[in-house]
Amino acid sequence: MNQSQLVSVSTVWRYPVKSMMGEELNASAITASGVLGDRAFALIDNETGKVVSAKNPKNWPDFFSYRAAYALPPAADSLPPVWITLPSGRMVRSDEPDVDTGLSTALSRPVRLASFAPQAPSLEQYWPEHEGQANEVSQEGVAGDAPTGTFFDYAAIHILTTGTIDRLRSLYPQGRFEVRRFRPNIVVDTGELEGFVENDWVGGVIRIGESVCLQITDPCPRCIMPTLAQGDLPKDLGILHNGIMHNKVHVPFAGKALPSIGVYARVISPGVIRCRDSVKVEI
């Protein structure tokens, strides 16, 4: 194996509730289920039984206006309640008896907050028109390569590099390419390395800090989510058409080439990661 030393972990992110805004961290435990407390909760649509996701903005147009944060630091043996800030500024807590009522009222649709995924969970994913294809909504499974009962789209860890962000900015300078558009768990500062750096990592492993080891399994396919407005970031379909579409690569779990940004990873060895930890990649 060829081994190269990268610069460091740039940032670490956790999203307590699936598809809501999350938390930037200085450090986190990495467990078999990924960043401790990541996507531990999700909303379930009571009418369809599907997991609520910003991937279908037709049904959930303002979901990125909701923000989730733990009331206390999570522990490996128990997770504390989560505070959810609604677009109105009102806050509800996951352990309140009327939390489902508050969320349903805010969303104008009956939902329930869940901490364990239902059997065979799925969500609706909207694909905007591109390359002559009509707009469509597909039904997608959840947690394909992640532990049972979790709410990950596919894998427990999502990694992005600064090299990729820089490449996207060069392709579409008018677009605001920021890390939060892509919702990674770990951002790796690749220094002077240029381009879609992590494409070459698929099939290899990366070692972070003293003990964490991750196997890179697949590129991360992209849909509508990175183009959506969130906070001061505007809605911009050019993010997809003029940026992401330039990186169509083979995705093993899909069996075809798809527009992708970042990579998915499986946890081999758990531990703790911190910002500025060294990162080594073995390909």
What spans do the regions from the language model cover?
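Metal-cofactor-dependent catalytic cores
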Residues: 1-283
